[in-house]
Amino acid sequence: MVTWGITALGHDASITVLEDSKILFAAHSERYSRIKNDEYLNEQIVNDALQYGIPQKIIWYEKPLLKKTRQIYAGQWSEALSNKNLPKNYLKQFFDFIEPMPEIKYVPHHKSHAAAGAYTSPFSKATVVVLDAIGEWDSCSVWKYDRSITASPLKKLQSSRYPHSFGLLYSAFTQRCGLKPNEEEYILMGMSAY
């Protein structure tokens, strides 16, 4: 089964193509568009991914409707009420030649991060810690990974939720230092040695 993992409409859009559990293709949109942290896919990256097969399933990196509940809580009404940022609406432009469109499975943002770390590691058992600015609601989560549990090898043990976020605090310090949040945190990290 050909499956595509897609992230877009936030920052750093990318596509990974898998057949069963083998990675066939992976690319960042910014490599094609030359736009740093490009949030959108483009025809070229999609066409390159299509060379490995039309997806039977698309795995989307977050749960957009759950994210909208947090946006409403935070007062981000225009984002929360927009239909443009719904993956199914957005992806139609790339899959207008397929009827019906491939099934989209939405995976929690932090589970996407945890899976990327766990499934690409050499360990069969691990504790996975995800710490970022924010997912749908989670800002920090701890996961138990056990490859021998084939049905569900990742299990969330604990999480911290918005508005409590080390990642947002880190971005705020980045901005306070005159740097661009969600992009130049690495500069602040480098400065911390001094």
Sequence positions of predicted segments:
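Short acidic/glycine-rich loops and adjacent helix/strand connectors
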Residues: M1-Y194
